Structure formats: C-alpha cells, structure tokens
Amino acid sequence: MTQKTRKILKAALTAGVALAMSGSTFAQATAATPCFRGINLSGAEFGKPGGKINKDYTWPSEETVAYFASKGFDTVRLPFMWERLQPKLMQPLDKDEVGRLKEAVERIRAHRMRIILDPHNYARYNGHLVGSELVPDAAFGDFWARLAKLYANEHDVIFGLMNEPAKIPIAQWLNAANQATAAIRGKAGADNLILVPGTAWTGAHSWMQPIYGEPNGVAMARFEDPGKNFAFEVHQYLDDDFSGTKNNCSRSDDAVDALKSFTLWLREHGFRGFLGEFGAPGGKVRCIDALKGMVDVTEDNKDVWTGWTYWVAGDWWPATEELNIQPTAEGDRPQLAALKPALSDFSAEGKNCPSLN
C-alpha cells in the first residue's frame, strides 16, 4: 500500500508432493509445486528507524502464523525495515535484528509455509532514494548481498527486492534493481526466486503508463537477471485511486481488468508475475466479489502467475482497518470467503503451479 497508510505448504496441501528435508528447511519439490497463496504479516516495518522491539514494532507471533496456516495459506510476505536490519550502509547487518528475522522465518517454516522477504522501504533509506548520491546503487546491492547470503539457495525463501518503489524515475529504479540482482547472484551466490517491482508503487493499473519516465511495461522488460529466476511483482487495489486507503470498491472492474492486461503483457514477453498486495473492505458484497475476481485471474493463468499474497494482517493491526483479515473475537473476517476456494483447492491441478515448475 502507499505510505499514506500504513502459503506454507500445510500438511494436507503437501500430500503427494515429495519434499527433500534438510534441517528446518524444505528444499524444492521434486513433484508439483503450488502457486503462492499467501498473506502479508505486517508489523516489523512499523515505526521509525531504530525503535524498540515489541514497543515500536513487532514480528509475527506464533498464534498469528498458526492461524493463517490453519486456513490454508502457504506463503507469508514478511515486511521489515531496511534501516533496522542494516543501520549503516555498506556495513554488516545488525546481529540482534537478524536474529529476530531468523526467528520469524523459523516460526513460519515450522508451519511449512514459504517466506517472501520484503524490505518495506519504497526505494528509500532514511528518506533518500536508492540510486541517489546518499544511497548509491552499490549500497542497495551490498544490502541484498548480505541478506541473500543468509538464505542462499534455500528455496522456501523468496527475495522481494523492494516494496513499492515510489516517486523514483524508472531508469534510476531499473539500474538499482539490476545491481541488487547481480549482487544476489554474484556475491551471495544465491539462485532463489527474486520478485521485481516497477516504480509508481508498482501498480498493475499503471504498468503501461509513463508516470516516472518510460512505462514500467517498457523499461522493466530490460531488467537483467543472470540467474533467470524472477517474477515481476505488482500491487492492485479496488478503491477510487487504487491506493487501498479508501473504504470503497468503486474501481473494482478496472482493477480486475488491470490484472488481465498485465497477464497479457506477461505472456507476450515470456515473463512471470506475482500479485504482492491486494485487498478489499469486508463489509460489502461487491468488494468480496471483486476480491475473488482478482484471485481468479491469477488462478486461471498459472502459466504466468506465480501466485498472490493478500494485504493485510498482523498482530498490531486494529480491527477497524477495513482490509485487515487478522481474526477477531467474532472469528474469521469476511474476505476469507473470497480467498477460500483457492486456499482449499487440494486437487492435483490446484497443487501444481506451471510457472514455478
């Protein structure tokens, strides 16, 4: 989502899927691999740089992880703050925060869920754009080389380069993304899947619009991955400005059409896609129907879509947040009805994601 606001391979899902186990990490499946059907568990990106754990920010609790695993989610997108993980550019990662990250990853792994690492920084470090004099591309590459080494070639961990690059020229962002990817493949020696956003908050609706220079759909076609293991990440909301900050679904049809258009772009260029954020208010039938329509686009086109992660849930999200699907004392949130058909699809076809195999 914009700065204005703020699966898990569960046992039943893995039946018939051969997994080679190594310690607490499960390796790539030797049989079919399901698409990502996940949830954003938000909290570690809260507050300002620094801050005190469990006062200013938090990592997902066991209770929250277990709940979403029990519902059939098989992936967690895990937002965190770059500045906390690396307080000084070009310097080692903070040992304490790395420890908290590792604990969160193991908590999620214990439920056989996959993890998407998400530096939730909008292409900034301490307010300065990546690719600027104060945050050069080399610093972004250094950060990713250090982070990728922690989970190099552990294929249940996916590297999301950056959350929603915003107000940054597309040429500047493309250079930074290419350098970070080169560092992941080179310095870290990691072959993990990389998720690559565009600029302009990586909206599917604006993928072909020239907002910060060339359209994402033109410039990002020049993205370079020496490992050739990446997918383009887009976000899409349903409200009047597609920000996900309004309590309406007035652009539902346009949002679904945007995903369909992005699907055509993926197929035309031979690329893969990932829907990293999408969500809807739970109190309106139209919104729930539109939410299902968005999921259906990805589920019906698994040759190019690697999956999705819903926004949002997390231990500290208020019950009044319209998009929040953290359970309340009354039980499950209404939005789960739109996600359930995909989460409960245990058929052979449902467990097979051609774009990941």
Describe the role of every protein-language-model region.
Residues Q28-T30:
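Boundary of Sec targeting at the N-terminus
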Residues I115-L117, G273, W308:
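Hydrophobic beta-strand scaffold residues
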Residues E330-N357:
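C-terminal functional modules
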Residues N163-E164, W308, G314-W316:
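Histidine-bearing beta->alpha loop at or near hydrolase active sites
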Residues T2-L13:
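Bacterial N-terminal signal peptides that target proteins for export
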Residues S22-S24:
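N-terminal signal peptide c-region/cleavage motif recognized by signal peptidases
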Residues A32-P210, P215-G217:
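Active-site mouth of glycoside hydrolases
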Residues Y57-T58, D142, K149, N153-I158, ...:
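Extracellular glycoside hydrolase catalytic/binding regions
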